[in-house]
Amino acid sequence: MRASNYHINTLKEAPADAEVASHQLMTRAGMIRKLAGGIYSYMPLGLKVIRKVEHIIREEMNASGAIELLMPVVQPAELWQESGRWEQYGQELLRIKDRHQRDFVLQPTSEEVITDIARNEIHSYRQLPVNFFHIQTKFRDERRPRFGVMRGREFTMKDAYSFDRDEAGAGRSYDIMFDAYHRIFRRLGLAFRAVAADTGSIGGSRSHEFQVIADTGEDLLVFNPDSDYAANIELAEAVSLLTERARPAEALQEVATPGAAKCEAVAELLGLPLSQTVKSIVLATESEKDGVQIWLVLLRGDHELNEVKVGKVPGLQNFRLATEAEIVEHFGCKPGYLGPIATAKPVRIIADRTVANMADFVCGANRPDFHLRGVNWGRDLPEPELVTDLRNVVAGDPSPDGKGTLAIQRGIEVGHVFFLGTKYSEALKATFLDETGKPALMQMGCYGIGVTRIVGAAIEQNFDNRGIIWPRAIAPFEVVICPVGWGKSETVRNKSEALYQALREQGIDVILDDRDARPGVMFAEWELIGVPLRVTIGDRGLNDGVIELQGRRDTETVKISVDSALKEILNKLETL
């Protein structure tokens, strides 16, 4: 490709609404242009990257035995109503009507459609197992689309769905996809982790996320550097350091804490470590049978509540935060000074494991500007109704596998695999006839990869103050040839053309910048775009029989012989 025949339109400044590096750099490099909130046009450079990502995914999916098809973006509401997700999915599901006033959705995912295909196409155990996949546009009506292609409303995903005769077969299909995903992300040139994860709205009983490691990631990944243990922080179990509660050493006393409504302020005022305080979080549930039920969740002052874990507590599946009126009614006090002793009305008390092991702790007195210190279970208040893991782990916590301690890093989710079981096949009655001629439900798995999200995540992991640093496998071009003096020197033009043709013959994706731009402008533009390897050809070097190479991550150029240039470039590419 010649730059003079290609669309390259870089910008000096990023748009004001671009919050993260990938959004800023993709816009400045001319890879995307915003059409509406969370909706982007992919310009030639950006689309080229996407196509390379898709190519790697498609190759590995084919190698794993998956079969490609294509399902529609527009799906009838009846399927979503049949699965129960028409109401469950929430406002992210964009609902539309056709001219006949029939309800449809713009697909955010395709479990319903693929299950409908399976129930109509698969009738016998002889047709199983099978794994279908497609790469398709999706739409989720995000309330606040942000971060460019990282959290857009319209995006591209690869979805695969496996169908098996039994749970054992579904487990094998899951493992095949799990391994295929490792191959995909390794080929993409990304540093990543596969972590155990919550199944979320998709459902199912087994799940792993594939997370690209990046300091700007929204997700917290918990792992053991000394073992294979890794999990999303939502799922990581917090193992209590203490096995036996200490004996009481203080008397219960009420202390004035004027204006200290936060645990941090209370600890500072009383001269105590934050870990000696207990925070009170008031939740509510509603049911036709019991009406509104108020729950008091107790957490150590230096810990954070894990809402996924709370949602798995029996009775708290559909919890919400209690209103201030509900809090005052049940505690006789506004938030900030709440505690489990002497509530105005009965509440259900559940405690994190760490809190249940505490002695002589500090909590709210259910009286404005007062707290209780020297509080002890059994002596000053009954043992909690339920003790369970309710908190996020912190770095240094014991690893759940018993092999050392945990570390935490940030990541960006780019892939997710789920074992679904019969969640959708049962809802949509997707059955097959087994060996005995009896109908049985298909066991399902689903496996997603965010194609456009990978592009953003790759940049978040690979950039500097000059621009993008693409992994070679997905760079828009592998090599850029930058002739210095293109319009003045026939020798420069001839050598540049010869090297350009030689690289093309070797199958290298190369672009020749024949626009006759000034060297500084030319170099800065290609550093912004992020091409992995730059070759500079000028009269001064040619007079000495050399040209210059510089990898995008390199700080210095390397002079190489003109005669061995092709070999040197190919060798350098192998290291990128």
Curated annotation (Swiss-Prot):
<dbReference type="GO" id="GO:0006433">
    <property type="term" value="P:prolyl-tRNA aminoacylation"/>
</dbReference>
<dbReference type="InterPro" id="IPR036621">
    <property type="entry name" value="Anticodon-bd_dom_sf"/>
</dbReference>
<dbReference type="GO" id="GO:0005829">
    <property type="term" value="C:cytosol"/>
</dbReference>
<dbReference type="InterPro" id="IPR044140">
    <property type="entry name" value="ProRS_anticodon_short"/>
</dbReference>
<protein>
    <recommendedName>
        <fullName>Proline--tRNA ligase</fullName>
        <ecNumber>6.1.1.15</ecNumber>
    </recommendedName>
</protein>
<comment type="function">
    <text>Catalyzes the attachment of proline to tRNA(Pro) in a two-step reaction: proline is first activated by ATP to form Pro-AMP and then transferred to the acceptor end of tRNA(Pro). As ProRS can inadvertently accommodate and process non-cognate amino acids such as alanine and cysteine, to avoid such errors it has two additional distinct editing activities against alanine. One activity is designated as 'pretransfer' editing and involves the tRNA(Pro)-independent hydrolysis of activated Ala-AMP.</text>
</comment>
<dbReference type="InterPro" id="IPR045864">
    <property type="entry name" value="aa-tRNA-synth_II/BPL/LPL"/>
</dbReference>
<dbReference type="InterPro" id="IPR023717">
    <property type="entry name" value="Pro-tRNA-Synthase_IIa_type1"/>
</dbReference>
<dbReference type="Pfam" id="PF00587">
    <property type="entry name" value="tRNA-synt_2b"/>
</dbReference>
<keyword id="KW-0648">Protein biosynthesis</keyword>
<dbReference type="GO" id="GO:0005524">
    <property type="term" value="F:ATP binding"/>
</dbReference>
<dbReference type="Pfam" id="PF03129">
    <property type="entry name" value="HGTP_anticodon"/>
</dbReference>
<dbReference type="InterPro" id="IPR002316">
    <property type="entry name" value="Pro-tRNA-ligase_IIa"/>
</dbReference>
<dbReference type="InterPro" id="IPR033730">
    <property type="entry name" value="ProRS_core_prok"/>
</dbReference>
<dbReference type="Pfam" id="PF04073">
    <property type="entry name" value="tRNA_edit"/>
</dbReference>
<dbReference type="InterPro" id="IPR002314">
    <property type="entry name" value="aa-tRNA-synt_IIb"/>
</dbReference>
<keyword id="KW-0963">Cytoplasm</keyword>
<keyword id="KW-0547">Nucleotide-binding</keyword>
<keyword id="KW-0436">Ligase</keyword>
<dbReference type="InterPro" id="IPR006195">
    <property type="entry name" value="aa-tRNA-synth_II"/>
</dbReference>
<dbReference type="GO" id="GO:0004827">
    <property type="term" value="F:proline-tRNA ligase activity"/>
</dbReference>
<dbReference type="InterPro" id="IPR007214">
    <property type="entry name" value="YbaK/aa-tRNA-synth-assoc-dom"/>
</dbReference>
<dbReference type="GO" id="GO:0002161">
    <property type="term" value="F:aminoacyl-tRNA deacylase activity"/>
</dbReference>
<dbReference type="InterPro" id="IPR004500">
    <property type="entry name" value="Pro-tRNA-synth_IIa_bac-type"/>
</dbReference>
<comment type="subunit">
    <text>Homodimer.</text>
</comment>
<dbReference type="InterPro" id="IPR050062">
    <property type="entry name" value="Pro-tRNA_synthetase"/>
</dbReference>
<comment type="similarity">
    <text>Belongs to the class-II aminoacyl-tRNA synthetase family. ProS type 1 subfamily.</text>
</comment>
<keyword id="KW-0030">Aminoacyl-tRNA synthetase</keyword>
<dbReference type="InterPro" id="IPR036754">
    <property type="entry name" value="YbaK/aa-tRNA-synt-asso_dom_sf"/>
</dbReference>
<dbReference type="InterPro" id="IPR004154">
    <property type="entry name" value="Anticodon-bd"/>
</dbReference>
<keyword id="KW-0067">ATP-binding</keyword>
